[in-house]
Amino acid sequence: MSRIGRLPIPVPSGVDITVEGATITVKGPKGTLSHVVAEPIVVNTEDGRLLVTRPDDERRSRSLHGLTRTLVSNMVTGVTAGYSKTLEIVGVGYRVQAKGSDLEFALGYSHPVPVKAPEGIRFEVQTPTRFVVHGIDKQLVGEVSAKIRGLRKPDPYKGKGVRYQGEVVRRKVGKTGK
């Protein structure tokens, strides 16, 4: 039995969960998320908790058991507390500014780089070199953050670029002069 999949998912008050066939819909104070559960896995509600079970011990069932439990747990956390990722910009002249609900970056290119906020994502600019990506879908928050980081990855020689808060950038030693 999967150690993670075996754990029940506590459902806080204010969260409404409906299971219709293979689709799980989670409604909470911050919004609504839904997920289609893969074939062999079954999700049941039982006195204020969700239980994820598998019918057999086939390899596919075992691998999907813990995954499904974690995805549903992330949905419950997302609609109650939400997710956020803080990113920092390091470099002379590198900055970010809010343009309505979107962001505009100056990252050393000859043009500003606009980033539109997808549905369900909210940007918060704290300083010109620090901003936060907020949302209820953990996967979408991570994906948008990774795309923004990919606009100018941290340089291993000078450390310039967009990085996650607390990310350690391994630095290389430059060439030695003669």
UniProtKB/Swiss-Prot annotation:
Recorded hits in HAMAP family, A to Z, give: Ribosomal_uL6_B (MF_01365_B)
Tell me, in a sentence or two, what this protein's role is: This protein binds to the 23S rRNA, and is important in its secondary structure. It is located near the subunit interface in the base of the L7/L12 stalk, and near the tRNA binding site of the peptidyltransferase center.
Q: Which InterPro entries match?
A: Ribosomal_uL6-like, Ribosomal_uL6-like_a/b-dom_sf, Ribosomal_uL6_a/b-dom, Ribosomal_uL6_bac-type, Ribosomal_uL6_CS
The record's comment on protein family reads:
Belongs to the universal ribosomal protein uL6 family.
S-adenosyl-L-methionine found in the keyword field: no
**In which domain of life is the source organism classified?**
Bacteria
| Name of the protein in question | Large ribosomal subunit protein uL6
Biological processes annotated in GO = cytoplasmic translation
Its assembly, as annotated, is: Part of the 50S ribosomal subunit.
**KW Thylakoid (keyword) present:** no
> What GO CC annotations are associated with the protein?
cytosolic large ribosomal subunit
GO molecular-function annotation terms? rRNA binding; structural constituent of ribosome
**Protein keywords:** Ribonucleoprotein, Ribosomal protein, RNA-binding, rRNA-binding
